[in-house]
């Protein structure tokens, strides 16, 4: 085979390989880039996970997840509300109020945000701001029994007893088995020295829920006339909730 033929064969093989390579698909690495819709969905799932962790008492983990959800989607008021709840669970009340503020900027007509804000202010003993928030929320959603109850408690603290009764009665009319509101009606009657009405309210609350609070309240109410029965009831209440031994705890329960 002469040199010319060998050169031609070599050129043919090179060209053929080049043509084959040109037909081979390139291997390009694939990166998943989520769109806005997918990001929103992921953030809501993370937020849901953060909310569920609160029920298991995993407050720090809940806070981390809630912050992650917000870092992905800061335009959802529900995620800000979840973050606020996680912050409250970690005693970060000022930060929680800022989160509620962010949520209200996104959706100022969401009543739950004002109710949550009111609850946070109550934890901070800021009665004035708590009342403003609760009243604003009730303008939007007037039949929220928990908000009515909390507003009644504020009036009770302020010794505006008739106003307190009105709020408790509104809540009870909506939710007849709302024993906490019935119990606090009894507290109002007790403060007004209407002992018979107070006893009736406490007994009604106990019939719905044998909680330590109305049992102890009943014990105090009947103490002057039925001392032995009062002692029995007081012991029963303290067995159910020993925290009532603490004067600070009783004060927190509006005693």
What is each residue range found by the language model?
Residues 55-64, 89-102, 123-136, 157-170, ...:
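Structural signature of tandem alpha-helical TPR/SEL1-like repeats
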Residues 42-43, 77-78, 111-112, 145-146, ...:
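Helix-start (N-cap) detector for alpha-helical repeat units in TPR-like alpha-solenoids
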Residues 51, 85, 119, 153, ...:
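Residue-level recognition of tetratricopeptide repeat
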Residues 27-39, 231-255:
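Terminal, low-structured helical/coil segments at or just beyond the last alpha-helical repeat
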Residues 72, 106, 140, 174, ...:
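Structural marker of alpha-solenoid helical repeat scaffolds
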Residues 82, 116, 150, 184, ...:
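Canonical tetratricopeptide repeat
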Residues 2-73, 78:
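N-terminal leader/linker segments that initiate helical-solenoid repeat arrays
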Residues 203-246:
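TPR/TPR-like (Sel1-like) alpha-helical repeat modules
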């Amino acid at each position: 085979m002469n040199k010319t033929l060998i050169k031609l064969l070599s050129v043919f093989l090179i060209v053929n390989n080049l043509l084959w390579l040109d037909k081979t698909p390139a291997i390009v690495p694939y990166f998943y880039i989520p769109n806005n819709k997918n990001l929103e969905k992921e953030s809501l799932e993370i937020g849901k996970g953060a909310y569920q962790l609160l029920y298991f008492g995993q407050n720090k983990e809940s806070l981390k997840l809630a912050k992650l959800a917000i870092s992905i989607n800061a335009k959802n008021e529900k995620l800000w509300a979840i973050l606020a709840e996680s912050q409250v669970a970690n005693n970060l009340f000022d930060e929680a109020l800022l989160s509620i503020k962010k949520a209200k900027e996104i959706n100022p007509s969401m009543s739950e945000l004002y109710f949550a804000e009111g609850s946070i202010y109550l934890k901070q003993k800021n009665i004035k701001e708590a009342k403003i928030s609760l009243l604003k929320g009730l303008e939007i959603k007037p039949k929220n029994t928990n908000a009515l109850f909390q507003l009644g408690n504020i009036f009770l603290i302020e010794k505006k007893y008739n106003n307190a009764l009105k709020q408790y009665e509104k809540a009870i009319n909506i939710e007849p088995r709302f024993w906490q509101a019935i119990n606090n009606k009894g507290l109002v009657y007790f403060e007004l020295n209407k002992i018979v009405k107070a006893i009736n309210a406490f007994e009604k609350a106990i019939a719905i829920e044998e909680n330590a609070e109305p049992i102890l309240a009943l014990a105090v109410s009947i103490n002057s006339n039925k001392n032995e029965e009062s002692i029995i009831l007081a012991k029963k209440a303290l067995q159910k909730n020993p925290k009532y031994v603490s004067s600070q705890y009783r004060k927190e329960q509006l005693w």
